Amino acid sequence: MKRFKTVHYTIHSNKIKDARGIRFAVLADLHGMEFGPDNRKLSETIHRYRPDGILIAGDMVVRNDSASLKTASSLLRSLAQQYPVYYALGNHEYKLYRTDPQENCMAARYQEYEKELKTAGIHILHNESCSLQVGKNSLTVCGLEVPLILSLIHISEPTRH
């Protein structure tokens, strides 16, 4: 059976006004995988942590696998019924987004995927930012489409707990 890993990061900031803090679930690199029927195991784990929102860090799909679009769409539309969802593209989405849908059927399917997600209220951030309110806190979430060559630059990770 496929497994996913839950990692907790704590980021401290004097700008966070609520004593409880802010809690996000971050999904990345699922590549169309399913964890239990209808991604039930993943959804239940997310619900257990009661996040204030869901941040997608890309690669929910595989650029040459149309089934991955269906799996990701189903999961994200389900999550969007309970949480605000913000989606930044990974390299698989980016390549499909930048490809002419007239020349590539997967790029055309990807456009439909984005439409489905937007209809469900998911914020897809193409080099954009949006503001959100979580309790007493105002936050800005950004989605950057970084040229793939820049992904070779190393950025250190926050402390894991």
Question: Could you tell me what each predicted segment is?
Answer:
Residues 1-19:
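N-terminal membrane-anchoring alpha-helices
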Residues 12, 25, 123-128, 142:
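General small-molecule cofactor/ligand-binding pocket signal
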Residues 14, 133-135:
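Short strand-coil-strand connectors
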Residues 21-31, 138-148:
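Active-site-proximal beta-strand elements of phosphoester/diester hydrolases
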Residues 31-33, 91-92, 154:
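Histidine-centered divalent metal-coordination motifs
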Residues 32, 62, 146, 160:
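Short, glycine/acidic-enriched loop or turn micro-motifs at the edges of active sites
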Residues 38-133:
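Core catalytic region of metal-dependent phosphoesterases/phosphodiesterases
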Residues 151-161:
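Residue-level detector of conserved catalytic or cofactor/ligand-binding positions
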